[in-house]
């Protein structure tokens, strides 16, 4: 009950904060869905519609997408991220482990248009690659970055961060 009350209060406060709405077409959304070797479920379609409505509104979004392992939460997240990228915003996709971050990164590379600027920031990246990624995020040369909690540090500055996905 206390968790519910805390989340309710957070949602109320977030709704009061104004933001720039994202304007996007359904073209990247539809192209990505057509690449899938399965059809989205009605629940996935509804989740995407709700997320897209929130993204295009003037209120901040705080949404929990829940489901069993393999239920398609990642696909829904990636498709919604593509719409944000299409609106010229950056996306940060944080996973709890480096292995999972790499899996999401590889899936995005398969699904997203080839010209999408996608990077993985990991502890296995050498110091020069990390510095390059940090600079590219700051200069909006990267549209979506995947990583662990390391993508949220003081030295990492996004040019135009518009969407954060946290996979728990």
In which residue ranges do the predicted regions lie?
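Signal for well-folded cores of large energy- and translation-related assemblies
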Residues: 33, 37, 52-56, 109, ...
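Conserved RecA-like ASCE P-loop NTPase motor core of nucleic-acid helicases/translocases
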Residues: 90-97, 119
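Conserved helix-turn-beta segment of the N-terminal RecA-like "Helicase ATP-binding" lobe
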Residues: 100-136
